[in-house]
Amino acid sequence: MSTQTAERFSRFADFYPFYLAEHSNRACRRLHFMGSLLVLIILGYALVSQKWVWLLAMPLVGYGFAWIGHFVLEKNRPATFQYPLYSFLGDWVMFKDMLTRRIPL
């Protein structure tokens, strides 16, 4: 597994290139995309059906897909462990960038 940098990021704009470098494997990015998409679907279902217990599945699905991508495909440690907030934001920015085809899906 690759080692994380000891660098601390004070701005998300500085963190995001590091985040993308940790997601160089296309299959890993696709797993992130699927996890994020399923999180949105679960959220929509919970809101429409008012079955709030489904909200508990959101972190399991979102992080589950992402972590499989990191440990199995990227062979690195998810940035979430060192940068939880920036990593969470990075997931959604990367999702948007894949939707808009700025990053290949």
Q: Can you annotate each of these PLM segments?
A:
Residues 46-54:
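Transmembrane helix interruption/hinge and helix-loop junction motifs
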